[in-house]
């Protein structure tokens, strides 16, 4: 899914001229947010015109417009990077950047989210952010709009409901993001969409089948997303008998080797109202890190040692067979997982001290990995840092791990590279990709099949509307002409 460092360095050399130009332009942008460039054109108008550039490609995002869990949010294919984010009314918006012509197209609205048109609840629900796929025929797919589905959709057979409806939009033409249509072929009871296309073209859509107290499932398509099979549960929610709570989960699914998918996840103790620590009731309390494999050819699930697992996996089985790390009193927020060149899994997990808030407290990104015999790691990427951090990573050799992490520094939002040549035990900060005053960043997972110029999407949050979205690469953001916004 993510190109290795050799391919990235090769592409970086080919694009050296453009990156140098972008860097020159951005010298002014970093101070002012806008840069002016003179250009000579073969037109009937003035020979010298001034073009103003900005670092962002869109400024109409709302709420929390990006997250790592809904992935991929962007894909690079045939020299074009396709990007998506949550725009006005929580609708999905899609744009493209052509790396050869340096031209942006869009953003275009890809669908209509029920979350932005619901009665009651918070101003922004934020759970229906778009997830993207490009099928073997070139059609662009967007999955969006659900926070478990609504009771008006009927009874959820695999859990409970909340708001919205999980939807599936597809472009009307291959590789064309200007026109879209909805396909009524997935259950409305969904949220946290994650989609993977296998080498043979089969599509696997993973999501939680409802609100907090629901199973995690997948639906499979063998016809480029035109139809999907019924949901199959792979993580089980169930009532606990020892405390006033329900077993629940948060998962991240990615491409493994060959026909395999890899799944990392953490456990959510879903307390009843008035129960739990200090009677806080339902909070975001989560703990521990788990890992398992899914062989899509044989339909067999297994743990890291190859031991078979029966579906759906329960808390008891997960603790016994798939546990990668106990986090103790630390609360978690799940991250991503990838394989190194030896086929060993590496997991990003965010964990922090419970400070009594509804969300516990700030969580810091940590690295956990399997060395072929045992699970190791758990150290902070940013040693000594106690604020909020989030990130995704590439790993080639077990001793060559590279994270792109956002964190707070001196009141600024920072996105920078962090590198480890010590098997993930310690990391050092490299170049800063983006830094903004008096803001926070929300980020996507690393872009699928990423181009060196376009590695990740970043939302600059100063308020909850008119949020700027950036496409950032190895050395900074891809600029866009202000007149083209």
From Swiss-Prot:
GO molecular function, one term: lyase activity
InterPro entries on file: Sialidase_sf (IPR036278)
Top EC class of this enzyme: lyase
GO annotations of cellular component type: plasma membrane
Protein origin, superkingdom: Bacteria
Residues with site note (Neutralizes the sugar carboxylate group at subsite +1): 208
The protein's Enzyme Commission number: 4.2.2.-
Protein name in the entry: Ulvan lyase
Compartments, record wording: Cell membrane
Membrane in keyword set: yes
